[in-house]
Amino acid sequence: MKRTFQPSNLVRKRRHGFRARMATPTGRAILKKRRAKGRHKLSA
């Protein structure tokens, strides 16, 4: 059986990157929450 995690930097960026977050209202809410919490890293 193959493992479920097959790392790919391209897919990682596209799905969880900053621009992907900014593209949707919910994503912007996530960034807002992470800024409020003081996260050093906002997105992948």
From Swiss-Prot:
What organism is recorded for this protein? Rickettsia akari (strain Hartford)
Locate the compositionally biased regions of type Basic residues.
30-44
Family, according to the entry, reads as follows: Belongs to the bacterial ribosomal protein bL34 family.
Question: May I ask which residue range the UniProt record assigns to the signal sequence?
Answer: none
Q: Does the keyword Thylakoid apply?
A: no
Q: Where is this region: Disordered?
A: 16-44
Report any one BP term from Gene Ontology: translation
Q: Which InterPro entries match?
A: Ribosomal_bL34, Ribosomal_bL34_CS
Q: Report if keyword Zinc-finger is assigned.
A: no
GO terms (molecular function) for this protein are:
structural constituent of ribosome
Q: What is this protein called?
A: Large ribosomal subunit protein bL34
What PANTHER family does this protein map onto? LARGE RIBOSOMAL SUBUNIT PROTEIN BL34M, MITOCHONDRIAL RIBOSOMAL PROTEIN 34 FAMILY MEMBER
Listed under GO cellular component are:
ribonucleoprotein complex; ribosome
A Pfam family reported for this protein in Swiss-Prot or TrEMBL? Ribosomal_L34
Q: Which terms are listed as keywords in the entry?
A: Ribonucleoprotein, Ribosomal protein
What HAMAP family would the database entry show? Ribosomal_bL34 (MF_00391)
